[in-house]
Amino acid sequence: MNFRYNLIQKFGRLIYRKFNPVPRSPWTQGKVKDICEINLVPPERLKSFFAHCIKILQKIKGKDIGDYLEFGVFNGSSIGSMYLTAKKENLESMRFFGFDAFQGLPKNAENEDDGVWKKGFYACSFDKMQECLKRRDVNYKQINWVKGWYNKTLNSKNINKLKLNKIGIVFIDCDTYSSAKLVLDFIGPLLKEEAILCFDDWKLNDLDIKEMGEYKAFNEFLDKNPQLQAEEIKSYNRKSKSFLIKPIKNNI
């Protein structure tokens, strides 16, 4: 199973986007007056989406849907939206995990995905991110933070240390192909029950048509994991893609 486009689908998307381009992220790098005011996705839209995800998973798994993992935190707007939604829905069992180096994109990002990324894109310090969350009425102390580059932090040692064993929602917003691949390899062994995977930059810069970025990483992941099937669900904006992941049951 995969979600690769055939030639007709590629051509159709190319023509459509020529006249209706996918919106770019509103901010990448450089100084801004107040980084906490930047919302790459409107918070209310994200809250509505997360509430929908919770309902989908609760129909399948019951009240305890599992933990929330976010890869690429930036100023905390996404993880803050999930936190507030979970509190509103009384998901007391859900834990929150934020994985980020808090230094923006790494240097090698410039050599990936048709050169669309630059070192330092989406940089927000850990201290500033905490301030942003406090201003959103989010208790950052109730979130588990894993700071560092993914090639150093996404490993079995941290799986055991964090006691990761039940995943509910995964928000992948780390942009590059290599980072998305590391994330998927990390969570793959944990996908033993239904979960929802959200790819924030699936169509950004038309990387899906170019067979790069998150599009490439996810399709390769599905190729390597035939025990998993994916069903696309409605996502929160045009540039993103979201999927319900289901382990294939062995009835033998």
Spans of model-derived segments:
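A short alpha-helical cap/connector motif
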Residues: 1-252
